């Protein structure tokens, strides 16, 4: 029997997705009354770069993060082979993350600011970022980052509830999904760096590259630990620690890059 998602989860996921679709529509139709669209788009750009422009900036990338968070929470609500109370607690933690990121976007990174001047054309996206690889790199990378929110929420729920080991199987599945997305995102970024003049080849130990490598290494350790667990409490505690570490590094890396502290040619 397929589980139906809780109504609250469905509402949160629908709201976050609708907000992002509204922003994407503004980019597609070149609505320059939106200041974010004016800053990062142009009416003559190909459709793929209009769409990728939605996440080619700080505000849009935070909205993308929230949208992926809602999608993953929605899919997790269909998870079987896990206790109902444990799943509900995990979704409550996910809802709390939605609230935190939503408040951050509203008060510091609002992508829906109205342009104060009437314009007929936008400034356009940085030409260096108008690349097929870079068009899909951020969503895949963010899917890896945000996927660890599920693993994090499962681990926190495990600290509050004494359950059997079934949650470890679910955590392993989501950690593999997250690590795979993260690997793909890093690989696409490296591919772009390989042929982008002056970037330094496949891997240049650039700070932005290293930021994405940190959760990848922690995620690899988490996957191996989840495959080794056989009821040992010590390994379970290690798994909880790695789950928290992976998500913490993902959040830290995202905000560090998007804050402008690592001001490099990157998105």
What are these model-derived regions, one by one?
Residues 1-16, 20, 265-266:
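Single conserved hydrophobic/aromatic residue that forms the stacking wall/gate
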Residues 3, 114-116, 146-169, 191-198:
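Conserved, charged catalytic cores of large soluble enzymes
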Residues 3-4, 14-17, 47-68, 86-93, ...:
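Membrane-entry segments of alpha-helical transmembrane domains in multi-pass membrane proteins
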Residues 4, 14-17, 75-99, 159-180, ...:
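Membrane-interfacial loop-to-helix junctions in multi-pass inner-membrane proteins
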Residues 17-18, 22-26, 66, 70-73, ...:
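Helical transmembrane-bundle signal
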Residues 18-50, 61-108:
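Hydrophobic or amphipathic alpha-helical targeting/insertion segments
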Residues 25-59, 110-138, 163-164, 188-211, ...:
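Membrane-interface interhelical loops and short amphipathic "cap" helices
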Residues 216-264:
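Polar, glycine-rich mid-to-C-terminal structural blocks
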């Amino acid at each position: 029997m397929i589980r139906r998602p809780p109504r609250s989860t469905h509402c949160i996921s629908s709201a976050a997705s609708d907000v992002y679709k509204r922003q994407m529509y503004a980019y597609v139709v070149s609505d320059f009354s939106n200041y974010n669209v004016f800053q990062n788009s142009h009416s003559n750009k190909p459709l793929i770069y209009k769409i990728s422009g939605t996440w080619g900036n700080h505000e849009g990338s935070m909205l993308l993060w929230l949208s992926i968070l809602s999608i993953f929470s929605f899919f997790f609500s269909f998870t079987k082979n896990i206790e109902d109370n444990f799943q509900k607690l995990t979704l409550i933690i996910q809802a709390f993350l939605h609230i935190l990121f939503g408040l951050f976007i509203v008060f510091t990174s609002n992508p829906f600011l109205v342009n104060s001047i009437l314009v007929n054309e936008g400034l356009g996206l940085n030409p260096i970022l108008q690349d097929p690889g870079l068009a899909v790199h951020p969503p895949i990378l963010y899917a890896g980052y945000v996927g660890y929110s599920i693993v994090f929420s499962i681990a926190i729920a495990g600290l509050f509830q004494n359950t059997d080991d079934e949650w470890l199987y679910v955590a392993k599945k989501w950690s593999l999904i997250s690590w795979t997305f993260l690997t793909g995102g890093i690989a696409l970024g490296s591919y772009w760096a390989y042929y982008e003049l002056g970037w330094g080849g496949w891997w240049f130990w650039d700070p932005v590259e290293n930021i994405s490598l940190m959760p990848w290494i922690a995620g690899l350790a988490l996957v191996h630990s989840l495959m080794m667990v056989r009821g040992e409490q010590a390994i379970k505690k290690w798994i909880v620690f790695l789950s928290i570490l992976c998500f913490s590094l993902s959040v830290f890396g995202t905000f560090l890059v998007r804050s402008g502290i690592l001001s490099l040619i990157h998105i």
